[in-house]
Structures are given as structure tokens and as C-alpha cells.
Amino acid sequence: MKILSCLCSYKGCLSSKEANEIILNHNHQNHPDKEVDCFSFADGGEGTLSVLKSIYPDRKTGCYLLPGPIKCNEAQAEYGIQKDTRIIETSKVLGLNLNPDLDFDSTTSFGLGILLKYGLDNGIRKFLVALGGSAIADQGAGARYALGYRFYGKEGKEIFPLSGNLGRIQSVDSTKADQRFKECSFTLLADVKSPLLGENGSTYLFSEQKGAKKEKLPIYENGRKHFNSILVNCGFPDVSMLPSSGAAGGLGSFFYRFGKTKVLSGAEFLLKEAHRKEKIKDYDYVLLGEGHTDRGTLEGKSIMPRLSLIRKSKAKAVLLSGIVDEDVLPELKKQGVSFFCPLHDKACKDYQKSAKEDLEKAYDKFLSLLEK
């Protein structure tokens, strides 16, 4: 029996590499008759740099100390270098793990703007940006601030933009904006296809996992609509309904507005880079997993691109996510998931403490199902 462990990161818990190594080591110690290979994976979001480093170990990387998603906190933001292209993983500077208190209202993409500005200062005009795993929902307003844009409220008082105050912004001043940004081209890696606005947009799909209260979602959605209209009135294109414009808290829309932007499936991109697409057919089972499988998963993130590849092979898909919402089970079965072995029955506060043991138990449960 040949098994491919192709787990994504379990946000706030385990990286893709850690999760797959847990399976590999546990199998070696307890199920030596099973052959397991690992492929640390990302969907274009969290873990992308790590995967690219494993594929191309000789490529250079760098690191900056930057403001995190909560401006007063710092983040060690690693980036990659590929010839004349700067590779940025938004979760390195804006990740959920950098906002442990899930203070949704206070988050900002300011640090990302600083990281982009450093690239501009070094002559970089091409960026490969992995979207996903972010704690923010400010549509890139904080990044704009770092690049020279200024925002004002009703009485003309300057406002520092945050995920929770977009509805207060009444005007934008771009007279001191960094014009070099218009010279840039951006390739975005994202498997979230959701638009910025609407009932299937980023507010309703992803804000709760970032700390937003469910009863406040309409308020946040109205704030996003308002800020979007402010930008449109300033001459920026309305990109709010484009696919992936809602990715990473609206950062997709931020890059779209500067033109010269294309979006690629992160999963497809990484599978192609690793030459793994053609190898899936060699396995009997492929292990998939993420922290929380929900409606957002069905929008194309994480496991969905790999399911499409698995369906074309003899392999069967096994889902080892931390939590799997019941309302997505029917569609996942249609998409080819053969075994469901979630780590938890429902959301719990202390799952981080037992992540390793829970993942091992879920894997054991899958193997026991095969024996029935």
C-alpha cells in the first residue's frame, strides 16, 4: 500500500512540513508495513515559501523585521528571491499566528506595504505574492498607507486604516503615493476564488476565523462596500466582484487595482513546480488536511485543486482536517473524498496543545477503517 501525505498547514498549529513529518514518523514507528511519502504543501498561501525552498534549496531568501498584523507587534518576514522577482508570502508578515488574540478590528496590512516598499527600493518590479493565511481584512488599506496614501474621516482628520474602521474613511489623498508601484507586475497565488463583496465574499466566508463576531459581519461588509466605493470615486477600477479579489482579507483587490496583475492557482503552481501532478497516480491513498474545512474550502482553497487531480487517478482521497463542517460533507463526497477522519468533532479552544497526538490518532483511525 502506497500513501502520499499531502497535508496543508493547520493554521496556528502545525506547518505543512510539520504535519507531514508527523505522519511519516508515526507510520515508520507504528505501521512499518505501509509505505508513506510526503509532500509538504501549500495552496498559494501559508507555507508557500517553505515548499518552494524544499523544491529549490539553492534559491536565496532574505528576512526583514516588520510590523505584523497588529502594528505594535513585530514579525520576522522572510521573502524569496528568484532572479528579478521578489517572492512574498503574506502570512509571513500578516499571518493569523501573529494575532493570537484574534483582535480583528485592530489588524492592518501596513507591514506588507513596508515589505513591498523595500522591494521597490532594491529595484524590484516583479512580485510573486502568495495570498492566504492572513489575519487582516482591510483590503490592503494599511499597505496603501505604507506606500504614501493618506485617509481622512468626516472632519478631515487623518485616519490610520484598520480592518475595523474602513467605514469611517471619507476620502483618500494619493498625492504622495509611491508612483513606482505603477511600474510593477504581480503574479498572485491564490486558490480562494471568492470576490471581495457579497454573501459569498470574503467577509462572510473568512472573517469569523480571524476573530470577527458573527453578529457584526453585516457592519464589516458595509464598511468594505463603503471603502470600495471611496476608491472607485477616486478613479480606481471596481474590482470587487472579480475572482480572488477577496483573497487574504481583500488583498486580491489591492493588487488588482494596480493593473498588470494575474492570478494563478497556488496549488496548481506548486504541484507543477514540484513535478508532482503526474506522480499522484502512483499512490493508493492521498492524505489531505487543513485546520478547518468549511465553505471557504469549496471556493477553491487548500484541498480542492488536489481533489481534481486525485479524481483523475486510481488514488483515493482521505481528509484529516482539524475540523470539518457538516454542511460541506455532501459536496466533498461528490468531489471524491473517500474517508473523513477529522481531528475534532467541533471547534475547541485548546486543540493546539494536542495537535501532534490528534493527527496521529486520526491517521490510525483511517488505517483501522481500511481493515473493516
Which residues fall in each region the model found?
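N-terminal loops that bind phosphate or other acidic moieties
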Residues: 2-131, 135-372
